[in-house]
Amino acid sequence: MFRSLLRNSVVGLFGLVARSGFHRLPAVDRAFIALYGIYKEYLEAGPIDRLREFVPSGSLAIDVGANVGFFSVRFARWVETSGEVISIEPEKKNFESLISALKREDLLGRVRALKAVAAAASGTAFLEINALHPADHKLSRDGTGIAVDAVTLDSLVPQKGSRRPSLIKIDVQGAEMMVLQGASEILKLSGPALFVELHEEGLARFGTSVSAILSHLSNYGYEAHWLMRRGPHLKASAAEIHARVARDGYVDILFVKAAD
């Protein structure tokens, strides 16, 4: 409950700044990005540095819904010079901030940054912009909004003769199932770890649900886990996941393939 209240407070603060027009000032914009990063690291994303065990040196990590680069910067550090990160972010201002963050950390050479959305099929999609919340831009369901390129993860990572992904992070405001549908070959043949945000209301906008995501990934042999600060990542039951979503509004879940 506290986490949800704080998240809403941060979003409300940005809304006030956006309505005032002060967000257009570079210093204010940088300050908000810094505040957002602190919020993500300490209150929302949980013990994300534990994801490093799924992103070894020389590996390929994919950040779907990269926003301003909170995860992409970390992934790029972890893969080191012999690895690669694919960062996908469709919104212009966020994409520019993503590139700036990577340049600032001298990591841009390790990242293939795409101004696009990941979807079930390649082509063109439409993005609804939320001017009051830079992390709440959504795919349109009715063809309105800003036209953006759409790509499938399978098209970005051919399964023959290329590096296979070790981790895919997905946070796309309810369109997670569409991303997964466009990654069927990756899920089947590579079986990377997945770190996915589950938000019942957001998923419902696209005609799906938390239960549907769990079932879909179970069909590929994935099991849900809590990302733990220490020790093994504990298995998360469907009932526990639904309870956490009901309490907090959303939850981040680590999915790994079951051991044979």
Language model features with spans:
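Phosphate/nucleotide-binding beta-alpha loop and adjacent structural elements of enzyme active sites
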Residues: 1-260
